[in-house]
């Protein structure tokens, strides 16, 4: 973790002097009763103004005499005697203000405005016009200080150089960094787009417990908390899957949930302990239906949010307009490690040898299915750049998926990859209660053997299956990783507003 470098003595002294000066200005404001007013109302944002009026000439604007009210943070100011130009930043972007001493109430310009600081939040009212350079501006007839900023803008409005500060003080990052603001606007649009897509297909949004007595629905190490009133250890959920399928048992044929999951694991450019998932369950469907739905979802979001089905990412481009590639797990291994013999992947000892040759540490508890999966992850996963579905996952690593009718050693499951990363996981659900109970027991044995990510035995879920789960397909998509792809972000911390960080220095 990077730490902020200590400030040079001169810089620290300059900052302390500025902080002191700003606080003295606030004291003066309090004495006048003008500190922190709450009666100013804006009627437009900067992006609305630019969208509506950028195309008009100054003569047309003057003839229309359009008066608007805006509010935002003062980012720059150029004082030129009796007149000034201000850049005001709001949620939509920036708009220029023209401030003239003679157009404001007496004393406002010299006694107030010129004493305000960059970072202060202002309210402005005036008529639209365009400067000689063609920039849409507001000729202010009223200007008010709404909030006094007691600290200066980061790095004199040149952005934040320190990545750690960007994450730890996200509010500063959002003030200074246009790209960050745009990333989180796109994230919001993606979330809204997913909800619209699902509702249009008759899915019902639901909420399931975030604290669970038995963590389930995924293989991961959970966070543990304690319920004082019940005197009971509980777990932050690692997945909502088992609760969502209980709802399908109850008769809700199409359900989805967008919410946080928690996994007590490491932090990396692709992993955050608290992350957002969308999970859906659809009765009377199988994993092939989910492949079609996933392809349609990504294609729709790319077009609606970004305006194109071709999405740039680093030096690559992901094409969501073309049919997505589909490979079985073993086909992918053979494609990217052609020296592999297909027959070797059906032999335990030979698969062990392949895994060891790849530098994989083979655990005693692994069966053939886990070995093949590890070989796939080592040899093929990083090469799956364009949207690709990998199918035929071994039953050993798919404790909740339905076995394939032709080969019970594999399941009707897929994972969805883009840019060498897993983005989604879907399968035909296991609805055989007895088979599910047996697989839970296998997971318990694995946990007893030292696998702390193996699942617990969930007796109530087995009971729910005994009441009858219709043929069902389920899908989970990592929202954070999806946003990374759509915003050309290369670390998950860039797409989570407040990512997990080690405690910083004071």
Swiss-Prot record:
It catalyses: tRNA(Lys) + L-lysine + ATP = L-lysyl-tRNA(Lys) + AMP + diphosphate. Pfam families: tRNA-synt_2 (PF00152), tRNA_anti-codon (PF01336). It comes from Erwinia tasmaniensis (strain DSM 17950 / CFBP 7177 / CIP 109463 / NCPPB 4357 / Et1/99). This is Lysine--tRNA ligase. It is found in: Cytoplasm. One of its GO terms (biological process) is lysyl-tRNA aminoacylation. The lineage of its organism: Bacteria, Pseudomonadati, Pseudomonadota, Gammaproteobacteria, Enterobacterales. Homodimer. The keyword Membrane does not apply. One of its GO terms (molecular function) is tRNA binding. Mg(2+) 1 binds at residues 415, 422. Keywords: Aminoacyl-tRNA synthetase, ATP-binding, Cytoplasm, Ligase, Magnesium, Metal-binding, Nucleotide-binding, Protein biosynthesis. Belongs to the class-II aminoacyl-tRNA synthetase family. One of its GO terms (cellular component) is cytosol. Mg(2+) 2 binds at residue 422. Binds 3 Mg(2+) ions per subunit. Its cofactor is Mg(2+). Its EC number is 6.1.1.6.
């Amino acid at each position: 973790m990077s730490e902020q470098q200590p400030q040079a003595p001169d810089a620290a002294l300059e900052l302390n002097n500025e902080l002191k000066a700003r606080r003295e200005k606030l004291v003066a404001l309090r004495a006048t009763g003008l500190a922190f007013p709450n009666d100013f109302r804006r009627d437009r944002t900067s992006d609305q103004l630019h969208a509506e009026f950028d195309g008009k000439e100054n003569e047309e604007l003057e003839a229309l005499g359009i008066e608007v009210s805006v509010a935002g943070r003062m980012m720059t100011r150029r004082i030129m005697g009796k007149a000034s130009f201000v850049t005001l930043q709001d949620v939509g972007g920036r708009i220029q203000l023209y401030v003239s001493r003679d157009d404001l109430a007496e004393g406002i310009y010299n006694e107030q405005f010129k004493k305000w600081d960059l970072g202060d939040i202002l309210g402005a009212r005036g008529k639209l016009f365009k400067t000689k350079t063609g920039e849409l501006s507001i000729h202010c007839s009223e200007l008010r200080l709404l909030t006094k900023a007691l600290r200066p803008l980061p790095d004199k409005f040149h952005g934040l150089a320190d990545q750690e500060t960007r994450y730890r003080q996200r509010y500063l990052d959002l003030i200074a960094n246009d790209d960050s603001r745009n990333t989180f606007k796109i994230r919001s649009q993606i979330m809204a787009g997913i909800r619209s897509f699902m509702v249009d297909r008759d899915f019902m949004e639901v909420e399931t417990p975030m604290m669970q007595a038995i963590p389930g629905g995924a293989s991961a190490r959970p966070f543990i908390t304690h319920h004082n009133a019940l005197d009971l250890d509980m777990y932050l959920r690692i997945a909502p899957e088992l609760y969502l399928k209980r709802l399908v048992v109850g008769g809700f044929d199409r359900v989805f949930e967008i919410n946080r999951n928690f996994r007590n694991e490491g932090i990396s450019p692709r992993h955050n302990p608290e992350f957002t998932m969308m999970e859906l369950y659809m009765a009377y469907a199988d994993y092939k239906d989910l492949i079609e739905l996933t392809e349609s979802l990504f294609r729709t979001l790319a077009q609606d949010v970004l305006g194109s089905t071709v999405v740039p990412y680093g030096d690559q481009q992901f094409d969501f307009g073309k049919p997505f590639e589909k490979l079985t797990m073993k086909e992918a291994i053979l494609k990217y490690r052609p020296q592999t013999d297909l027959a070797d992947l059906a032999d335990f000892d030979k698969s062990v040898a392949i895994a060891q040759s790849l530098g994989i540490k083979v655990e005693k508890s692994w069966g053939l299915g886990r070995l093949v999966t590890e070989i796939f992850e080592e040899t093929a996963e990083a090469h799956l750049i364009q949207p690709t579905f990998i199918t035929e996952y071994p039953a050993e690593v798919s404790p909740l998926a339905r076995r394939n009718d032709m080969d019970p050693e594999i399941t009707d499951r897929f994972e969805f990859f883009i840019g060498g990363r897993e983005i989604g996981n879907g399968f035909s659900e296991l609805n055989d209660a007895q088979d599910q109970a047996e697989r839970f027991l296998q997971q318990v044995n694995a946990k007893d053997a030292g696998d702390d990510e193996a699942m617990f035995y969930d007796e109530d879920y087995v009971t729910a299956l005994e009441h009858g789960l219709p043929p069902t397909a389920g899908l989970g998509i990592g929202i954070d990783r999806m946003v990374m792809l759509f915003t050309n972000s290369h670390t998950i911390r860039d797409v989570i507003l407040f990512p997990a960080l080690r405690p910083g220095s004071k």
